[in-house]
Regions:
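Structured, acidic catalytic/metal-binding patches in enzyme active sites
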Residues: 21-26, 33-241
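A cross-kingdom marker for long, charged
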Residues: 236-293
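C-terminal motif of bacterial Sec signal peptides marking the signal peptidase cleavage site
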Residues: 14-17
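Amphipathic coiled-coil/heptad-repeat helices and related helical stalk/stem segments
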Residues: 30, 62, 156-157, 246-249, ...
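Bacterial N-terminal signal peptides that target proteins for export
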Residues: 1-7
Length: 293
């Protein structure tokens, strides 16, 4: 079970208005979204990098500007640091996701969505009976893996963590807290999440590599368009999965900036963009946040 890929499909490329165009770049050169944070005098204090959780073998995405920023940083802040500890991730998922006596999974969606739901379940290699004790949010995460491209072993998040080995690495959440956010969603919102995953699967099948290309190109407008019609367009899900988390992360990040730790922040691209993103939140706090690539 590739849980990080599931989570990535749900929350990594979120969406709200961000109109800043990427700097000029030679065609074909990867330029994932990278910003620097400076004080009022222009002194660079931090960096913000939008990650993706799975990539095909051989994908080139490490630019000179990115490598220079990593070298200048003093420490790393990420959603989850222990990405390689998959046994623990599976154990936490199984514990939080399992509650006996769940309603039949087909009753958790509208009748019109049931054929697509059962088709997706079949493609996971599971059966509806095997999901009889699985909570709705967990079914959504399992199904969200379908249609994705790439391998989590090649994910930008893992590569960034490896680049900071030997320096301080701080988790904003960790796996238990992150999955706990899904687990604590009201059942109504969990069902909205499941329905949204079913709808998004249809879009992903039309062009499975669309969001990956947008990430590589730093194409914020495409990422915005994708998510403005996706899971995070639901106000309650957006608040729980994006806005509230960003606010909590800002409370951890700002002291690190102010004490001169030079943090490099590497989180799902969703958490950077838009009025509710970390970029705008830092600007609202008086920092100068500028795009490097």
């Amino acid at each position: 079970m590739n849980l990080r890929a599931a989570i990535a499909t749900l929350v990594a490329l979120a969406l709200a208005a961000c109109q800043e165009a990427p700097p000029p770049s030679d065609e074909g050169v990867a330029r994932p979204i990278l910003y620097e944070v400076a004080d009022g005098t222009g002194n660079v204090q931090a960096w913000l990098f939008g990650t993706i959780h799975a990539l095909p073998d051989g994908t080139k995405w490490r630019s000179e500007k990115l490598n220079q920023s990593i070298d200048r940083a003093g420490m790393l802040m990420v959603e989850i640091a222990a990405l390689e500890n998959e046994p623990r991730t599976r154990a936490v998922f199984a514990r939080l996701a399992t509650t006996p006596g769940q309603p039949d999974v087909g009753l958790k969606v509208n009748a019109s969505d049931r054929p697509r739901l059962f088709e997706m379940i079949r493609k996971t290699g599971l059966s509806p009976r095997e999901l009889s004790a699985t909570e709705t949010w967990a079914v959504a995460l399992l199904l969200a893996q379908l249609g994705g491209t790439g391998d989590a072993e090649n994910g930008a998040d893992r590569a960034i963590v490896r680049a900071f080995l030997g320096r301080e690495i701080i988790e904003f959440e960790g796996v238990e807290m992150q999955l706990g956010i899904f687990d604590q969603l009201p059942e109504r919102e969990q069902r909205d999440l499941l329905s949204a995953v079913i709808d998004e699967y249809e879009e992903v099948r039309k062009d499975p590599s669309k969001l990956r290309r947008a990430w590589l190109e730093g194409d914020e407008s495409t990422l915005l368009q994708a998510m403005n019609t996706g899971i995070l367009s639901d106000p309650e899900l957006r608040e729980a999965l994006l806005v509230g988390r960003n606010q909590a992360w800002l409370q951890q990040l700002e002291p690190r900036i102010e004490t001169g730790d030079r943090p490099f922040v590497a989180v799902g691209t969703a958490h950077l963009l838009g009025d509710d993103g970390l970029i705008q939140m830092l600007r609202d706090r008086g920092y100068k946040v500028s795009r490097l690539q």
